[in-house]
A protein has these predicted regions:
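Helix-to-loop junctions at the C-terminal end of transmembrane segments
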Residues: 59-71, 262-274
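Residue-level signature of mid-helix packing/kink "hotspots" within the transmembrane helices
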Residues: 53-61, 146, 256-260, 264, ...
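Structural signature of the two symmetry-related core transmembrane helices
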Residues: 74-88, 277-291
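C-terminal membrane-cytosol helix-exit motif in multi-pass small-molecule transporters
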Residues: 153, 173-194, 381-386
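Juxtamembrane intracellular "pre-TM" segments in multi-pass secondary transporters
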Residues: 1-7, 187-216, 401-408
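Paired small-residue
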Residues: 86, 97-105, 300-308
């Protein structure tokens, strides 16, 4: 399938991603509630949240290498199967150790799906379409993040949190399996024909030294860490402040709804501010809002802050994908995306574990101050990133001239 062709595949990918991400977003708070019901403290919740990213940490680059030299589509059903199994088995687990293991399986499945899906978008989109198509692709994640917490909050309640959280995890596993219905022939078999041979692979060091790749990785790490800790620790904050699980689910879904709204207007925002300014401003505002969540605010103020924060966090993921893809050497874009996901998983391992330690020492609201500091650093990193990748204008459109023509013919 040539880049810039029919986008029916993108709609089906968004639908599949909505179900897969919805299952994960439903399972993550359910895992936290089930762990608390089984006797976990704040530190244990942080460790279990970190294990979710541990297996993917070692698998990301090999999967990216494989995708650079082959097809993207096989990773998608494999990811769905692992997510479904991880959710269901987490619900059946009777110990914190078993929950941690199945949480890791769930994370590995999510990694497989995301590497395959992001590589598919990069490969089947023309350069000037990538900001838009990655933005639309991440709407699938936002839809899942919108529905998942509400569903979890509706199912988790009452005195028997262990039983209700287990039910939520089983429902999440079943819901994820629905994603398989949208994945049939989503990638043309001829799309992988132009991939480089395995012997031609680009060294990881060269990819990481490409201007724009480190900045894209760090911004993505910061934004995802913020989203991840919000999902894992807002239930803990709710327990300490007396906020019901159903309300916590609504608060998390407000954040996701704001992220969807952001991505729907991403193209006009890029035209107005440009990629560098937009990333910098949203990371800076996100830092202030994360710190604000640590304050003992009423529920309505918490809802307002989470809505604004969701809008700010909606910018980082799609723009960091485009930054990394367009900065990476030819023939190594899937590996570059995998390195970006490795950075994400490093953040998902280190941030929850650090949050657990900080919460144990300074209280359950302290991790949000830590997130604010991380987003503040990412704002500085975004400010120093390239204003525009080769072959495109600041608003994401194609630059006219021989360089742009060559760029479009390179085959994403």
């Amino acid at each position: 399938m040539a880049p810039g062709g029919n986008r029916g595949w993108l709609l089906r990918l968004v639908i599949a991603f909505s179900f897969a991400q919805g299952a994960v977003s439903m399972a993550r708070p359910a895992v936290s509630y089930r762990a608390l019901a089984l006797g976990a403290d704040e530190r244990a919740v942080g460790v279990i949240a970190g294990v979710y990213a541990l297996l993917p940490l070692f698998a990301a680059v090999p999967l990216g290498r494989r995708t650079d030299h082959g097809r993207c589509a096989p990773l998608l059903p494999a990811g769905v199967a692992l997510i479904s199994g991880g959710c269901a088995l987490s619900g059946l687990a009777g110990s914190l150790g078993a929950m941690a293991v199945w949480s890791g399986v769930m994370g590995l499945g999510h990694l497989c799906f995301v590497i395959g899906a992001q590589s598919l978008v990069a490969r089947q989109s023309a350069p000037h379409e990538q900001d838009r198509n990655f933005g639309h692709f991440t709407i699938g994640a936002s839809l899942g993040q919108l529905v998942g917490p509400i569903a979890a909050g509706a199912l988790i309640g009452g005195a028997d949190r262990a039983h209700s959280s287990a039910l939520a995890l089983l429902v999440a596993g079943a819901g994820c399996a629905v994603a398989l219905s949208s994945l049939w022939r989503i990638e043309s078999r001829t799309a992988a024909g132009s991939r480089k041979a395995p012997g031609d692979r680009v060294p990881v060091r060269r990819i990481l030294r490409a201007r724009g790749v480190p900045a894209g990785i760090f911004v993505s790490l910061s934004v995802l860490s913020a989203t991840d800790i919000l999902t894992a620790y807002l239930p803990v904050v709710g327990e300490h402040r007396g906020i019901a699980p159903s309300v916590i689910g609504v608060l998390l879904s407000l954040r996701a709804a704001a992220t969807i709204a952001c991505r729907l207007v991403l193209t006009p925002l890029l035209r107005l501010l440009g990629r560098t300014a937009l990333l910098t401003v949203t990371c800076l505002l996100g830092a202030l809002l994360c710190a604000g969540i640590a304050l003992p605010a009423p529920v309505w103020a918490l809802a307002a802050m989470l809505t604004a924060l969701g809008f700010c966090l909606g910018v980082g993921q799609p723009l960091s994908m485009t930054t990394v893809v367009q900065a990476a050497p030819d023939g190594a874009r899937s590996t570059a995306l995998a390195l970006r996901l490795t950075g994400n998983r490093l953040g998902q391992v280190a941030a929850p574990a650090s949050a657990g330690l900080v919460a144990g020492v300074a209280g359950v609201a302290a991790p949000f101050v830590m997130l604010g500091a991380l987003l503040l650093v990412s704002a500085g990193t975004a400010l120093r990133s390239p204003a525009r990748p080769s072959g495109e204008t600041e608003d994401g459109g194609p630059r006219q001239g021989p360089e742009a023509v060559l760029r479009r013919k390179s085959g994403i």
